[in-house]
């Protein structure tokens, strides 16, 4: 059920299947929505505290693992079985294909897809906006009063400078 819901998410959002060229004419392309690789770590035979420690260590390692922008995938998925009734789904995505705001939306959609499949039905979700449509909307917004208001807001937010961020690099 989980793999089916995750595959449904990848099918809905082409950006999650994106790859980037090394300098050819085409800068970005989409891989077909096939071949979901959900890694499974079964730590249910361990003490719960040790399983939690392994999860923390594995998540830290996951954060340090770079993405291959050319060959992908730019989204990695794995499931840790901590106890027979407690699991952790770990989703790591490159910021080029999923930012913090869209990640929240994806989790909500995944929940809807999972629950629908669990009930034996189809999820009722609005059509997903393609990256191309999103870029078109941004282009239409250029110069609008809404865009100008947003620009004024962010200039005010960072009038004293933006804080330095420590981000892992690829």
Task: Show where each model-derived region lies.
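Acyl-group handoff/entry surfaces in thioester-processing enzymes
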Residues: 1-32, 46-141, 147-149, 156-170
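Short, charged/polar, Gly/Pro-enriched secondary-structure boundary elements
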Residues: 31-39
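Helicase-core coupling region on the C-terminal RecA-like lobe
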Residues: 43
């Amino acid at each position: 059920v989980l793999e089916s819901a995750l595959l449904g998410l990848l099918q809905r959002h082409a950006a999650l299947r994106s790859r980037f060229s090394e300098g050819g004419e085409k800068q970005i392309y989409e891989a077909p929505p096939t071949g979901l690789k959900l890694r499974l770590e079964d730590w249910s035979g361990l003490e719960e505290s040790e399983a939690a420690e392994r999860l923390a260590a594995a998540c830290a390692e996951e954060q340090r693992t770079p993405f291959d922008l050319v060959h992908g995938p730019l989204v990695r998925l794995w499931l840790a079985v901590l106890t027979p009734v407690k699991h952790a789904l770990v989703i790591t995505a490159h910021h080029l294909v999923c930012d913090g705001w869209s990640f929240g939306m994806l989790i909500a959609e995944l929940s809807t897809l999972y629950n629908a499949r669990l009930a034996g039905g189809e999820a009722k979700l609005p059509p997903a906006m393609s990256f191309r449509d999103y870029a078109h909307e941004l282009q239409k917004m250029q110069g609008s009063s809404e865009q100008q208001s947003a620009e004024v807001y962010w200039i005010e937010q960072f009038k004293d400078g933006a804080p330095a961020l420590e981000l892992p690099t690829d």
